[in-house]
Amino acid sequence: MSDLTTIARPYAKAAFDFAVEKQQLGHWSQMLAFTAEVAKNEQMHELLTSSGSANKLAEIFIAVCGEQLDGHGQNLIKVMAENGRLLAIPALYEHFAVLKQEHEKKVDVEVISATELSEQQRSEIGSKLEQRLERKVQLNCSVDETLLGGVIIRAGDLVIDNSARGRLKRLSDALQS
């Protein structure tokens, strides 16, 4: 999968730069999200891995997407088909979404807690993270009762483990060393 990510990066960057230039970031995001779902479809995946001609594959892919693709989106599909890169479309969308979030100064944050967080707790966590990360934060909260207490917060590469389970593990590691 990392190969597809590497392949997708320049396409995602080009699509992102074009979308920013044309002030169509939302439109391109929706269009690429749709194409990623089409590419993930089992039957489409089988077709894309077949040895069909690039033009035929692009034609079929564009036909399946229908009006969800504008002319520029169709051109992207044609170029990717010519280069044998249609399987990288889901990775292209993922990278595009990351670029979009960076551009909009937003970040998705996963908050895992031992119990359901109150609205006040969510608000406090959100505001503290916005200050620390200097970005608009979108919290995605879930409950994992095995934490015993506390929370684990993941925002990109940042991981804050303030769970009772995490603290017990760190204590155990310290005692064993």
Swiss-Prot record:
Cellular component terms (Gene Ontology): plasma membrane; proton-transporting ATP synthase complex
Membrane topology field: Peripheral membrane protein
MF annotations from Gene Ontology: proton-transporting ATP synthase activity, rotational mechanism
Record localization: Cell inner membrane
Function comment: F(1)F(0) ATP synthase produces ATP from ADP in the presence of a proton or sodium gradient. F-type ATPases consist of two structural domains, F(1) containing the extramembraneous catalytic core and F(0) containing the membrane proton channel, linked together by a central stalk and a peripheral stalk. During catalysis, ATP synthesis in the catalytic domain of F(1) is coupled via a rotary mechanism of the central stalk subunits to proton translocation.
PANTHER family linked to this entry: ATP SYNTHASE DELTA CHAIN
Name by which UniProt lists this protein: ATP synthase subunit delta
Lineage: Bacteria, Pseudomonadati, Pseudomonadota, Gammaproteobacteria, Vibrionales
